[in-house]
Amino acid sequence: MWKSVVGHDVSVSVETQGDDWDTDPDFVNDISEKEQRWGAKTIEGSGRTEHINIHQLRNKVSEEHDVLRKKEMESGPKASHGYGGRFGVERDRMDKSAVGHEYVAEVEKHSSQTDAAKGFGGKYGVERDRADKSAVGFDYKGEVEKHTSQKDYSRGFGGRYGVEKDKWDKAALGYDYKGETEKHESQRDYAKGFGGQYGIQKDRVDKSAVGFNEMEAPTTAYKKTTPIEAASSGTRGLKAKFESMAEEKRKREEEEKAQQVARRQQERKAVTKRSPEAPQPVIAMEEPAVPAPLPKKISSEAWPPVGTPPSSESEPVRTSREHPVPLLPIRQTLPEDNEEPPALPPRTLEGLQVEEEPVYEAEPEPEPEPEPEPENDYEDVEEMDRHEQEDEPEGDYEEVLEPEDSSFSSALAGSSGCPAGAGAGAVALGISAVAVYDYQGEGSDELSFDPDDVITDIEMVDEGWWRGRCHGHFGLFPANYVKLLE
């Protein structure tokens, strides 16, 4: 067809698109009111769009899909980069077991092509490095072991004549060996067993073995009940210090008592030797101290004298209890190591017995606790000895037992609510004091108070420990923890 148009001038007129309506003077707005209301026709710049054009949407989607596939092809793995990369450039990714067309395998030569002269050490045995280690040549000479008839047996087991000691069998024994056989049971010395002969070898005694002379005294499982105030208080350190000081004081007083008893016995023996005309009263006084039932009789006589004197024998005892009241300062000088105000003063024996004696006094049974019985025993012996020996010096028994009666009388006064008599010399009712420090009672007979608490009805039973009433309780408290009110 193109041949038919050759030589003709064909001109195609191209219609030029009109300008925008705002610049074209002959623009005609052919949009109806419905199209303007519902957006059926798109006008550029109006902000309203026409309905979706399916053809335009299909073309746009296909174009976007082509662009996406092109990106995937560029970014995704390429098949041309396998087995060494594209054109074999990426050698690090080449398959090691893959062989290309340029590979030339070395085929073993045929037997007709091999040089047999180079076997077993190379040609004419020159290649020694390739010779078979287990192969033996014609120049090999083997050393055959000698026959038994040809061996020199004089060199066995230590060499010839035993000279080669380094080759000696360690387990072999010669004729000079003398074994030590264990003795028979009839030949053994059994006196050396379990501690050696007669127990002399102490280093071989069994540590867990106990002899007949090791006897342990029976112990009691009694534990003193702890009050609620003492259990909840935080003064465990003060309690331990107080208990240790009380234990030391008790031991020291027991030693003093034992020394005084021994000294009095010696003096009593000396008096009996010097005055042979009156030995009977001394024997009568020594005999009651030995039997066991004596403490019961003494306790029955010691408790009633507070009210009325039963007999003439108890009168010297009661008068002697009333006279040693001035000895309290001597008793107070014993605790020297507690001058510091915050520290608790040592509790004396009379302080410990203050609360126990009134309890047994209030009960109908007159039997007291067994603790004061040995002290009453010593006191009775002491008083009877004082009647016999007027020139004998006063001992520590009066100092220990004198405050006991005074505290006993003061306890009776405190329990009855009336002032004490002249027997309790240091007791003064109606005294009040204010607490300076916090104190928690360690026992049921002690007070517990806080700072600035007022303590009334104070009884100065001792220099270190007083007795008073606080928060409805009546008991002991340390004197250096309070300040007297004027």
Swiss-Prot record:
InterPro entries: Hs1_Cortactin, SH3-like_dom_sf, SH3_domain
Modified residues (Phosphoserine): S275
Gene3D superfamilies attached to this UniProt entry: SH3 Domains
Record-linked SMART domains: SH3
Membrane topology: Peripheral membrane protein
Biased composition (Low complexity): 406-419
Protein name (database record): Hematopoietic lineage cell-specific protein
Phylogenetic lineage: Eukaryota, Metazoa, Chordata, Craniata, Vertebrata
Gene that specifies this protein: HCLS1
